[in-house]
Amino acid sequence: FACNFANHMYALSARILEKHHIPFEVMLSLIDETAKKVHELPPAKAQTGPAIRYDENVINRHLDLLADVPDMQELYEKISKSIYKQK
């Protein structure tokens, strides 16, 4: 569950970045930092980002950027809600 789905999220992110002519490599330090945190904290405590804070402005901007890919937009909404509910 954790690794298989995480890798799929990387693949989806790569598609989005490629569409905007941004190399996936810009994500590597963030991916590394996120993975490192679970060595030091329980995963729920290591969670950061707009979903855990329920930052509607950022979430809505992200959803707007995904407007042309409704399947990713729906996935983003569902995962964001799941992250927020874990608080």
What residues fall within each predicted segment?
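NAD(P)-dependent Rossmann-like dehydrogenase/reductase catalytic/cofactor-binding core
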Residues: 25-87
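Active-site-proximal catalytic alpha-helix in oxidoreductases
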Residues: 1-18, 29-39, 43
